[in-house]
Amino acid sequence: MTFEPTETLRDPFVLYGESFDSRLLLGTARYPSPATLQAAVEISRPAMVTVALRRQGAVGEGEGGQAFWQMLKALGVPVLPNTAGCFTPQEVVNTAMMAREVFETDWIKLELIGDDYTLQPDTLNLPDVAETLIKEGFKVLPYCTEDLVLCRRLLDVGCQALMPWAAPIGTGRGAINPHAMRVLRERLPDTPLIVDAGLGLPSHAAQVLEWGYDGVLLNTAVAQAAYPVNMARAFAQAVEAGRTAYLAGPMPEREVAQASTPVVGMPFWHAENTEHRA
């Protein structure tokens, strides 16, 4: 009997040549309190925490912003600044430059919003902005849709990982276009893909990891849960379970039933009935 120990199923999560222990990224907005955020991060141990520079006051606008930044540093989790709230390419570039100075990192989650109602990314300008940031030395993680052509264009300009949505930000609906998401995974097998928006339940996270996605980024699903700390733990466990299931090689789906018990060794009267039915 062949048995693969669980240890051999663990594989590194690599982004821009850097390895991370977790496949969960966690947003820092909309928590009931800083203490709740801190506890959620501590229990889920994400690879990174995302911070919106334009909304958190991390530049030092008052004591609140400084306290927030000090708390993040004390947690010891890498910070991924984002450009949330930016609607023009110039806003994105300015925010990214400021974030690099404030947080002392070249990592940036690129958000360029094209519609303030759906919060859909501006897919027309996104590749050009990504290229500009990459030329400035940033490690760009672009928030995008599941559109294959857009994702290829982002790779062409130098992005080494992508963050397609499952559904619009904050909707919690899970993957609303499973076919397109699975096609995207199949067509870009060597690209790290992190599902960025629209997940509401741990089962949603497990599902996309089972499809072969490399990680998930969560915020509202944890921050707005009745018990955010418990939900953070549940998502961390779901991500691990989904990835382990993917690596384990799930059985193929079938259209018809197939008995799990073999005919060999069945009582003779059952075997007889089987032969007659055949």
UniProtKB/Swiss-Prot annotation:
<keyword id="KW-0808">Transferase</keyword>
<comment type="function">
    <text>Catalyzes the rearrangement of 1-deoxy-D-xylulose 5-phosphate (DXP) to produce the thiazole phosphate moiety of thiamine. Sulfur is provided by the thiocarboxylate moiety of the carrier protein ThiS. In vitro, sulfur can be provided by H(2)S.</text>
</comment>
<dbReference type="GO" id="GO:0009229">
    <property type="term" value="P:thiamine diphosphate biosynthetic process"/>
</dbReference>
<comment type="subunit">
    <text>Homotetramer. Forms heterodimers with either ThiH or ThiS.</text>
</comment>
<dbReference type="Pfam" id="PF05690">
    <property type="entry name" value="ThiG"/>
</dbReference>
<dbReference type="InterPro" id="IPR033983">
    <property type="entry name" value="Thiazole_synthase_ThiG"/>
</dbReference>
<feature type="binding site">
    <location>
        <position position="170"/>
    </location>
    <ligand>
        <name>1-deoxy-D-xylulose 5-phosphate</name>
    </ligand>
</feature>
<dbReference type="InterPro" id="IPR008867">
    <property type="entry name" value="ThiG"/>
</dbReference>
<feature type="active site" description="Schiff-base intermediate with DXP">
    <location>
        <position position="109"/>
    </location>
</feature>
<dbReference type="GO" id="GO:0005737">
    <property type="term" value="C:cytoplasm"/>
</dbReference>
<keyword id="KW-0784">Thiamine biosynthesis</keyword>
<feature type="binding site">
    <location>
        <begin position="197"/>
        <end position="198"/>
    </location>
    <ligand>
        <name>1-deoxy-D-xylulose 5-phosphate</name>
    </ligand>
</feature>
<comment type="pathway">
    <text>Cofactor biosynthesis; thiamine diphosphate biosynthesis.</text>
</comment>
<dbReference type="InterPro" id="IPR013785">
    <property type="entry name" value="Aldolase_TIM"/>
</dbReference>
<dbReference type="GO" id="GO:1990107">
    <property type="term" value="F:thiazole synthase activity"/>
</dbReference>
<keyword id="KW-0963">Cytoplasm</keyword>
<protein>
    <recommendedName>
        <fullName>Thiazole synthase</fullName>
        <ecNumber>2.8.1.10</ecNumber>
    </recommendedName>
</protein>
<feature type="binding site">
    <location>
        <begin position="219"/>
        <end position="220"/>
    </location>
    <ligand>
        <name>1-deoxy-D-xylulose 5-phosphate</name>
    </ligand>
</feature>
<comment type="similarity">
    <text>Belongs to the ThiG family.</text>
</comment>
<keyword id="KW-0704">Schiff base</keyword>
